[in-house]
């Protein structure tokens, strides 16, 4: 450990011990201490980073949070790659589990860094930090690098929410400028529970400030500017989503109605349906329902391939996070993603934890998921987050995006929970819902890729992402970043003609690669600026040149004003999803608790994702048309519904 890092960590410990919080500069990460970043040729592309522990202790002697610390890692763009609206946006990213580290997101998904096979960091060209500052948080306590000490683990989502609010309060004390930014809560999987619960607490916090103007707040009484929730492949409605497993597996030819095991699966589905119908929303989830997926994996275990050849042991089980892949049994995806060993290698390298301001004597080595967190979080007296969504939709935009190759939180289940949810005086998407094909334009290859489709109504947006797994940004970060572009309205709209669907096109207004030489081709404007600067240096004292520059500026400003006036005058009418809502006219360990005791064994292999987009996830032209999950009045399971 360097003397500087030792000094910084000592300062952090002293400040925490005295009840104070460190300053933002105390959390600064030196990029040259992270293996691999010294090899980045264009150093300006390396984001500003802050990382470390933020204590949850708020001076309340009645709680036991003294030893709870949440680890965070923040990325801020320094290369002017963000738009104006993105520069005013703060994204907080949460991974799921429960108990799985958000460093999955930081180092394998939407974060600024990716890790190679040697455990060296390189820049992620599809990082979301170019669409807003992004903060990855390990929570609840005990997850990833976050510590629980001798305190108790959280038992339900209400406790988790209370602790997140403590983290948020102290975070904004350390980074007060972020209070003025638009807050976006984003994440995936079990974060489909976390995010709505946290949003609900933020609404209550803001409401309390409205009611009690005289209350003295250490944060000057400012509200949190929560604007949107982005939930990817979320576990939101355990009942409805468990009932999607058999229909989804049939739609994707993962099981067959002609198989000997199919009657047993039908019986399990029927038992689950009966429990759900008689639940009344009182129980968080049923083991009998979640066991359906476990049984599907058991029955579809492969011993031989279609040619009768013995299957390698690491290819026996379908990967529940990406059904194009296989894994050993009973891991069935727990060894995935392929980058996971590299991330562990990176975080275990000398100096990395020091650079992240972590005391190696007090913080254990990094584990992706912690079973103690998931085993304690039972939610015995808690309803799932689906019950919170209707009210949240009155106050903010909610985006539910889904990779279409995921099984455990599959697109069928998410579409069905939308279909059965009542909000804004209607149930599910109506015939008035907006529908768009979503395309991604690759400026390097000049190709347009079919990325998915988008459906929107009354503050709710559903985004299907083609050829993507449970971890959408892992498969294609550039395309996944288009979800943020849709939220930020940084997309192009092509209005369909002759009964064709409208098309949303996302593309990168700036895309950089750390593998570049630092001599990338300049845009026309950049070349002009460079030429002008050079010209000024050579003729600094020339009166004629100064006059020419003044005239050039005048003509440039005039031309720019004229361009924007004409563009606004003749541009196509943008649909509601792309209009500011305020101006809109009225109209499991790693898995989701399915196998906590699953063994981690074997290596999975990866198939190519460059295939034709799936059509199973795409609704019919009738905008209200979704396939049905069996849910009959007589509590029975009808095969015809499949």
UniProtKB/Swiss-Prot annotation:
Where in or outside the cell it occurs: the entry states:
Golgi apparatus, trans-Golgi network membrane
Record topology, Lumenal segments: 20-544
User: What Gene Ontology terms describe what this protein does at the molecular function level?
Assistant: serine-type carboxypeptidase activity
UniProt membrane topology term: Single-pass type I membrane protein
- Bilayer-crossing residues are 545-565
SUPFAM superfamilies, per the entry: alpha/beta-Hydrolases (SSF53474)
Compositionally biased region (Acidic residues) = 519-532, 632-642
Glycosylated residue positions: 80, 425, 459, 467
Q: A GO CC term?
A: membrane
Instruction: Work out whether the entry's keyword set contains rRNA processing.
Output: no
Which parts of this chain are annotated as the region Disordered? 515-539, 609-642
Which residue ranges are assigned to the Cytoplasmic compartment in the record's topology?
566-642
- Principal subcellular localization: Golgi
* UniProt signal peptide: 1-19
Keyword flag Signal:
yes
- Which cysteines share a disulfide bond? none
Gene Ontology BP annotations: apoptotic process; proteolysis
From the UniProt record, list the reaction(s) this protein catalyses.
Answer: Preferential release of a C-terminal arginine or lysine residue
Which keywords are on file for this protein? Answer: Apoptosis, Carboxypeptidase, Glycoprotein, Golgi apparatus, Hydrolase, Membrane, Protease, Signal, Transmembrane, Transmembrane helix
The EC number(s) attached to this protein equal 3.4.16.6
Q: Where is the active site?
A: 189, 406, 470
Role summary: Protease with a carboxypeptidase B-like function involved in the C-terminal processing of the lysine and arginine residues from protein precursors. Promotes cell fusion and is involved in the programmed cell death.
Q: Which family does it belong to?
A: Belongs to the peptidase S10 family.
Protein name listed in UniProt: Pheromone-processing carboxypeptidase KEX1
